[in-house]
Amino acid sequence: TKKVKEVTKEYEVQNKHKPLWTRDPKDVTKEEYAAFYKAISNDWEDPMATKHFSVEGQLEFRSIMFVPKRAPFDMFEPNKKRNNIKLYVRRVFIMDNCEDLCPDWLGFVKGVVDSEDLPLNISRENLQQNKILKVIRKNIVKKCLEMFDEVAENKEDYKQFYEQFGKNIKLGIHEDTANPKKLMEFLRFYSTESGLEMTTLKDYVTRMKEGQKSIYYITGDSKKKLESSPFIEQARRRGLEVLFMTEPIDEYVMQQVKDFEDKKFACLTKEGVHFEESEEEKQQREEEKAACEKRCKTMKEVLGDKVEKVTVSDRLSTSPCILVTSEFGWSAHMEQIMRNQAVRDSSMSAYMMSKKTMELNPRHPIIKVLRRRVEADENDKAVKDLVFLLFDTSLLTSGFQLEDPTGYAKRINRMIKLGLSLDEEEEAAEATVVETAPAEVTVGTSSMEQVD
């Protein structure tokens, strides 16, 4: 009999483990979550936070979301190929990154979503129009906010989270119209009262003075610069806390939000900021306005189109003057940001860079002397020089860019000469002698050459 070789195949199940997201969260260990996170994200570190949840009702899906410990260096690159949310339908893998499951501002969150309701043959084009996907997306955002709340319970953990993903929270306030109030609770800022720690808006409101109606803030490059800004002088004198907003994205955030817990935001670098005053203070300010009317008019005539108007300030304490922008125009910091844009719209910039208002401190010695000089002689040349010098220094202290650096340097040099009691005519004569001396040597040299 002929022997027949019989081949049998035995199949071994490779994925013996039940998918992690289908298990009860109580039965999953921290180590299992960490291993799963590293497998789907290619990260070498454990996640900072984990959210394992399921949604049941009109639709059903399970999900695990992770927050990494560090933000990727190219997180805000527009053309970056992302690998964030993996989509499964009834445990069948559909795609590596489903962009429609998460808004852009949550681009740092990693995880998986397994839906029971989406069709297995769904295409990328159909996903964008799918109503089920929109409901899943809404639930994911909600659960992510809950996860951030859990992180915020530990002060040190949230400090690390905010250092890495604070910009994303602010981007969410700008883009997410459904959750701005909730996202504002996650914001942290330095302030005049917070010291080395950052403060929440909620804590700021609890520390507000009796009768204080606004949340005062100022935008700029750094905390160090803002601490010495002339804009916060009067607020500090009155014991009012001021928030320091030092990131460019803060400017865009404040365009979106107007209040927090019924307290309106007030930018100290713009017009329309008023502090609570007693009747005595109001009367004194009115008297100062009347006394400075002629001086303000003269300064406006000297400066011309450089400023819209010159007024008496109620926000200065020790500085002679500052420049403020209109309530709805760009601040000095925003103007600087837009100047640095490589492809900015020049026509839009010209429209938004509204004319500045110069505010004077009537109690400052320089302004008092200027007032006396104006009253003595409106055509005094020194007055004109002093006005331009005050305007240029106000540009610098208020965060603007100097319009004429050369002219500013010349005026400073003239003031230095006055301080050193140098005579400009004598100096000019000396310069002429120095210039003519080499000319004689040149003539002599050429004559010798002719003799040779």
Curated annotation (Swiss-Prot):
ATP binds at R124. The keyword Hydrolase does not apply. GO terms for molecular function: ATP binding; ATP hydrolysis activity; ATP-dependent protein folding chaperone; unfolded protein binding. Signal peptide: none annotated. It is found in: Cytoplasm. A motif (TPR repeat-binding) lies at residues 448-452. The keyword Chaperone applies. Keywords: ATP-binding, Chaperone, Cytoplasm, Nucleotide-binding, Stress response. It holds the Pfam family HSP90. GO terms for cellular component: cytoplasm. Molecular chaperone that promotes the maturation, structural maintenance and proper regulation of specific target proteins involved for instance in cell cycle control and signal transduction. Undergoes a functional cycle that is linked to its ATPase activity. This cycle probably induces conformational changes in the client proteins, thereby causing their activation. Interacts dynamically with various co-chaperones that modulate its substrate recognition, ATPase cycle and chaperone function. Homodimer. Belongs to the heat shock protein 90 family. The TPR repeat-binding motif mediates interaction with TPR repeat-containing proteins. This is Heat shock protein 83. It comes from Leishmania donovani. The gene is HSP83.
